[in-house]
């Protein structure tokens, strides 16, 4: 590994540990708990291994979410001030520091998810391009120029709305699930660089290319 690569890695780990050390603020309507897994497992990556032995659960008005975490992560609750600190056993260990910021971000996303929810907005750009809900909102029919019927079943925990034929709103507690479903719908027609037709997610933009003239 070169000096520059080591430098970039150390900066990335430092930033992640900075994120990990930030407190999480929770409202009285949110409950965060950590419990031992009944069936812990070992995950190996290269020469390192992690014992996934705990489950963090976040409950709120909009639902309940959980994330499985390694044994070296802990939660320090400060109920008086309504905050939680995520800590690790050894903040000097690069693998623990890397997971520190990642898990803290996941928990924060879950807290937002069970209180406010997460959104993804899809825009359909192109003549006749649109989305339509069928089967009482359980199926998204996508029309993007294909002659055959295309679409996806709406996963459990996801709500889809169509404020306009060319717009789709995906809502859910789990941010990863919301973005994954949006990405799957986008695959039916990713934005193309010549006319700009396609399915755009959130603030996505593309740079149009000039057509090659033979």
Swiss-Prot record:
A single cellular component GO annotation: mitochondrial inner membrane
Transit peptide start-stop: 1-16
InterPro entries: Ribosomal_uL6-like, Ribosomal_uL6-like_a/b-dom_sf, Ribosomal_uL6_a/b-dom, Ribosomal_uL6_bac-type, Ribosomal_uL6_CS
Localization terms from the record: Mitochondrion
Record's subunit section: Component of the mitochondrial large ribosomal subunit (mt-LSU). Mature yeast 74S mitochondrial ribosomes consist of a small (37S) and a large (54S) subunit. The 37S small subunit contains a 15S ribosomal RNA (15S mt-rRNA) and 34 different proteins. The 54S large subunit contains a 21S rRNA (21S mt-rRNA) and 46 different proteins.
Its job: Component of the mitochondrial ribosome (mitoribosome), a dedicated translation machinery responsible for the synthesis of mitochondrial genome-encoded proteins, including at least some of the essential transmembrane subunits of the mitochondrial respiratory chain. The mitoribosomes are attached to the mitochondrial inner membrane and translation products are cotranslationally integrated into the membrane.
Protein name: Large ribosomal subunit protein uL6m
Naturally occurring in which organism (per UniProt): Saccharomyces cerevisiae (strain ATCC 204508 / S288c)
């Amino acid at each position: 590994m070169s000096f520059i690569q080591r430098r970039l890695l150390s900066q990335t780990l430092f930033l992640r540990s900075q994120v990990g050390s930030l407190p999480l603020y929770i409202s009285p309507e949110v409950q965060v708990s950590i419990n031992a897994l009944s069936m812990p497992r070992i995950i190996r990556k290269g020469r390192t291994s992690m014992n996934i032995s705990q489950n963090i659960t976040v409950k709120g008005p909009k639902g309940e979410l959980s994330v499985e975490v390694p044994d070296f992560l802990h939660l320090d609750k400060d109920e008086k001030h309504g905050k939680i600190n995520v800590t690790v056993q050894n903040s000097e260990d690069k693998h623990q520091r890397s997971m520190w910021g990642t898990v803290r971000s996941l928990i924060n996303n879950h807290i937002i998810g069970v209180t406010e929810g997460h959104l993804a907005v899809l825009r359909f750009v192109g003549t006749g391009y649109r989305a339509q809900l069928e089967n009482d909102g359980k199926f998204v029919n996508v029309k993007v120029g294909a002659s055959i019927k295309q679409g996806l079943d709406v996963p459990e925990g996801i709500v889809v709305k169509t404020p306009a034929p060319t717009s789709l709103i995906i809502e859910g507690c789990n941010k990863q699930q919301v973005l994954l479903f949006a990405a799957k719908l986008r695959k039916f027609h990713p934005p193309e660089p010549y006319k700009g037709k396609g399915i755009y997610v959130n603030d996505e933009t593309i740079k149009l290319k000039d057509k090659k003239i033979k």
